[in-house]
Amino acid sequence: MNVDFIAGINNLGEKIYTCEPFKTSFQNPFIVALIITAVVLVVFFAICNPPVDKKRKTKTAIYLYICIVALLFLHYYVLNHQLNDIYNKSNMDVIVSSIHDKYKGGDEIIPPVSPPSISNELEEDRPKKILAGSKLAGLADSKPAEPAVSKPLVPLQEVIMPSQYNN
């Protein structure tokens, strides 16, 4: 897991639950995950094990609540501490590597790498013009392309209906 993934989880938890009265309790996404887990368990037990009589109903409810509380504690403490450890280690790795990269040779600071120029990228992405009388671009794989002879471009109407212009 990386820092961006954990930060994304935290941001998602904050964005979904932004109601003022519940903001403090639902700010942690792990609490939200635990509540969702509890709801899923309640629905699962209600569907798979419907109580028949009062004794069984009470016993099932007690077992259900014990399971939910145990899972809540398990999820919250285990996952939260593990992810906090991972988050702290990732932060330290990032800090140490950035300091190491900046100061490799003592006080010497390595300049940042400049991005490639935009004009070169645009020229490569731009479609190439096909001159009149040249072969189609799709047929270039059959044999090597001959040097293109520059001919003046012919108007489209003349290509379609040459008889009108020849008269």
From Swiss-Prot:
Residues carrying a glycan: N88
UniProt membrane topology term: Multi-pass membrane protein
Gene Ontology cellular component terms for the protein in this record: host cell membrane; membrane; virion component
The keyword Transmembrane helix belongs to this UniProt entry's keyword annotation: yes
Domain of life: Viruses
Subcellular location(s) per record: Host membrane; Virion
Transmembrane intervals: 28-48, 60-80
Main localization, broad class: host cell
Keywords: Glycoprotein, Host membrane, Membrane, Transmembrane, Transmembrane helix, Virion
Protein family according to the UniProt entry: Belongs to the asfivirus B169L family.
Protein's recorded name: Transmembrane protein B169L
Originating species: African swine fever virus (isolate Tick/Malawi/Lil 20-1/1983) (ASFV)
